[in-house]
Amino acid sequence: MALQVMFGLEFFLVLEALLFLFTCYQVVKAGRILDEIQDKLSEVKRGERVGTKRKYGTQNKYTGLSKGLEPEEKLRLGRNTWREIRRKRGKREKKKDQLAEVSRKRSLCSSLDGLGKPALSSSEAGEESSSEETDWEEEAAHYQPANWSRKKPKAAGEGQFADWPQGSRLQGPPYAESPPCVVRQQCAERCAERQCAERQCADSFIPREEQRKIQQAFPVFEGAEGGRVHAPVEYLQIKEIAESVRKYGTNANFTLVQLDRLAGMALTPADWQTVVKAALPSMGKYMEWRALWHEAAQAQARANAAALTPEQRDWTFDLLTGQGAYSADQTNYHWGAYAQISSTAIRPGRRSRAGETTGQLTKIIQGPQESFSDFVARMTEAAERIFGESEQAAPLIEQLIYEQATKECRAVHSPKKEQRLTRLAQGLSRAWGKPRLLKTDNGPAYTSQKFQQFCRQMDVTHLTGLPYNPQGQGIVERAHRTLKAYLIKQKRGTFEETVPRAPRVSVSLALFTLNFLNIDAHGHTAAERHVQSQIGPMRWLNGKMSLIINGMARILS
């Protein structure tokens, strides 16, 4: 068994050796055939192949010896020296740099206007000296056939159909080069203008339609000679407003400050509509702003109608909104009218947010994870939308903040509760005036020592109703109900909307209406019935004319 294994190994080794020898024989044979073919080739054809390889293939590094001619002739011409090699290499690099610069300028010009191929300037063309051209032609002559010559462009009438008679349909055109296409050149100019416009708008997030609207906004300025001129709104300012609206919302402080800055400029009603339409994210928001703007303009127009100056009486609703006769010319307004237009335009931005319950302050409660400062800011903002920026409502806001805060915040501020109640009472006194008399029920809130001390300090008489007698309290409640009803009626009128009044003035006007303008069936007002005595009919008593006054007879003399 061992002998068989050894015999098999020897057989495989001998077989591999034979295969190796056969492969070597084939390689040597192929090399001999290649040498024979190369020997048969002539020296001229070999030079042509080398020239073609150098012309169309990759250029190899120069070895220092020239092929095709004898070394003695090359040395005589000075083409094998290292100085000549470095000079030629520098020329090639310079030529490459020139071609790269020309191609770069050509691509730049074609991308901007596309009006044709640019021609090289005289300075660029002069860089090619006559000696360099001669060297290139001599170098190329070694690799080109003897019968080769440069083809010259044919002049007019020297084409392949030049021998045909004039008028023949095979006769060539009477010019050597094609004429320029005027239509194609005009199309290229329009394309170049469109590309420039697209490049100018490429770095903006605002669509092109909105940019056209922005370009129509022009505030009014007065020139040096007194004439009215328009100046465009800065693009960066409108862009900042649009970004602030998209990122933070229309009620953010940053957005409101930017609107206040824009309101300092004299913008026409059309300008405000254009700017707001470009800044708001949707047409629904714009329509909501436009409705609120018209509402504010109507209130301002009613206030202008009751103004003292005749100029302000002419500032109507159409003037403030740019409608009717003022739709065409909006640059010759009075400067005060532009201030009212700006104030009415930015007023809708300070209104309550959609879906937020700002009408009821009692529903604004501090959240469990909300900071106390954020809660105070929300309450203050909602109160300002209802009461305005008034110091009279500050005690009420403080009391609501204390009652609707979390337990932890109330525990911190609890020692100051008595001071807040005192400030609340003082605030009510400033708002409504110091009362002379207070009539309340017998509740513990009104019978406490703190309340009695407050009444003594304010010099107010405090009366309580009879215990277990709801009729006396009902009279007071009915009087309050009647007074409240008249206050609501006056608020619905036009005078209350246009001229905002203090609470004291509103109550005084309601009391004046109740006491002096309501007449009973006998033609007497409530004030007359209160101050006058009850006068009865006249009668004859003891032969004399007497008048019954308060149940007693008085003789008329």
Swiss-Prot record:
Pfam families given in the database record: Gag_p24 (PF00607), Gag_p24_C (PF19317), rve (PF00665)
Lineage start: Eukaryota, Metazoa, Chordata, Craniata, Vertebrata
Name assigned to this protein: IgE-binding protein
Alphabetized InterPro entries for the sequence: Gag_p24_C, Integrase_cat-core, Primate_lentivir_Gag_pol-like, Retrov_capsid_N, RNaseH-like_sf, RNaseH_sf
Composition skew (Acidic residues), residue ranges: 125-138
Keywords, sorted A to Z: Hybridoma, IgE-binding protein
GO biological process terms, semicolon-separated: DNA integration; viral process
GO MF term list: IgE binding; nucleic acid binding
Other comments on record: This hybridoma was generated by fusion of rat lymphocytes with cells of the AKR mouse thyoma BW5147. This sequence binds only rat IgE.
Keyword Kinase set for record: no
Entry keyword Nucleotidyltransferase: no
Chain positions covered by the region annotation Disordered: 113-172
Gene name as annotated: Iap
SUPFAM superfamilies in alphabetical order: Retrovirus capsid dimerization domain-like, Retrovirus capsid protein, N-terminal core domain, Ribonuclease H-like
PANTHER family, per the entry: ENDOGENOUS RETROVIRUS GROUP K MEMBER 24 GAG POLYPROTEIN-RELATED, IGE-BINDING PROTEIN
UniProt-listed Gene3D superfamilies: Human Immunodeficiency Virus Type 1 Capsid Protein, Ribonuclease H-like superfamily/Ribonuclease H
Domain Integrase catalytic, first and last residues per copy: 344-534
